[in-house]
Amino acid sequence: MNRQNLAALVAAIAAIVGVGLGAYGLYRSTTTQRDLTTAMATMDASSAQNQVVADRLGIATLQPAQATDVANVALDPADVPPPITRTEPTTVQVTLTAKEVVAELADGTTYAFWTFDGTVPGPMVRVMEGDTVEFTLINDLSSVNGHNIDFHAVNGPGGGAEVTNVAPGETATFTWKALHAGAFVYHCAFPPPMHHIAQGMYGAIVVEPVGGLPPVDREFYIMQGDWYTAGRLGNQGHQTFSNEKALAELPEYYTFNGHVNALTKLYPLQAEVGETVRVFFGVGGPNKGSNFHIIGEVFDRVYS
């Protein structure tokens, strides 16, 4: 077992709810770190490690897949707001609705997503530098949880989260000015924010510079997420959120746009030879980063 895998295993065990810090502290009080390291190093490598992680994290037997509330939670990457053609700032009204829906995470595997507007990622918001944004967040009456929104493009406490806390059936509105051009993430920051993000509550906001971006032939909008499910990767049935795996940063799934097959089977990225393509890419997380690239192509320009 290499040091990296050992560290990941120790971190996973230390974070378990049910074993907890108290139990972990008790274990440390009777067994030295050297003893623990020696014992782990003598294990039969992969099988022993996998079994310990599985036992400690409580990998579950799945219930049957549930009926879905929406045909597809994955957002079509071609669903991008049109480029801004005006040259003067204006007031822009934006409304998003927090919706909790059951949909497929993979073929034959359902999951209870928390979303903005019923998709993962949430819709891309597109404004211009200098615009005044009147933003409204609606929490659908069918929701079970409270939600809010944190725009990383907002200069202010929590990116708006402090003034957009909404219980099911409630609405909140706040106004802010887009001061800096760039591509930014937005996400739910309702406590605990990690849980809300891990359920799919993230998206992107693009603040175009005055005068707009250079024209292109096609645009795509893609966000990566990591999913912490009680069952193993590939198990069919209804997956539920595992707080233990999230704390240990051990995701079972990584997706682009909320579904295992979002950019292949569901919405393959298509362009013609010679076209100029712009990709808006972000990482929802909550824990893992990305080195996004396209096999067979080299980006002409990367900017944020």
PLM region spans:
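Copper-binding active sites and cupredoxin-like electron-transfer domains
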Residues: 2-304
